[in-house]
Regions:
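N-terminal basic/disordered segments at the start of proteins
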Residues: 2-14
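Short aromatic-glycine-(Arg/Gly/Cys) micro-motifs in beta-strand/loop hairpins
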Residues: 14-24
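Residue-level signature for short turns and capping positions that connect secondary-structure elements
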Residues: 25-26, 62
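A short, exposed loop/beta-hairpin motif centered on an aromatic-Gly-Thr core
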Residues: 26-37
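Long, charge-rich, low-complexity alpha-helical segments
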Residues: 37-88
Length: 89
């Protein structure tokens, strides 16, 4: 099991929590909270900084797919490669 990020999308909140789940503890640890506008770039940067390949988006709502698409765009703009797998849970 690899470490991964979980982004908790709440369309009624100004800040959406981001958690890191690592191999050893399997317990989520909050590492930040971001607006919907800043979330895709923040997730990509955190993933690359921590060598994470999986981002899970919790909160299956209309913003989940938009955030998923924006993550792919930000990853391409920032790093010119595709290594992050995004799952909507």
């Amino acid at each position: 099991m690899d470490k991964y990020l979980i982004a908790n999308i709440n369309m009624f909140s100004l800040n959406n929590q981001v958690f890191l789940v690592d191999d050893l503890t399997r317990e989520p640890c909050q590492i930040g909270a971001y607006s919907l506008a800043d979330l895709p770039q923040a997730l990509v940067q955190i993933a690359y900084d921590n060598d994470i390949n999986i981002i899970k988006i919790a909160g299956n709502n209309k913003y989940s797919e938009k955030i998923s698409d924006e993550i792919a765009i930000q990853e391409n703009l920032l790093f010119r490669e595709k290594k992050i797998k995004v799952e909507v849970i």
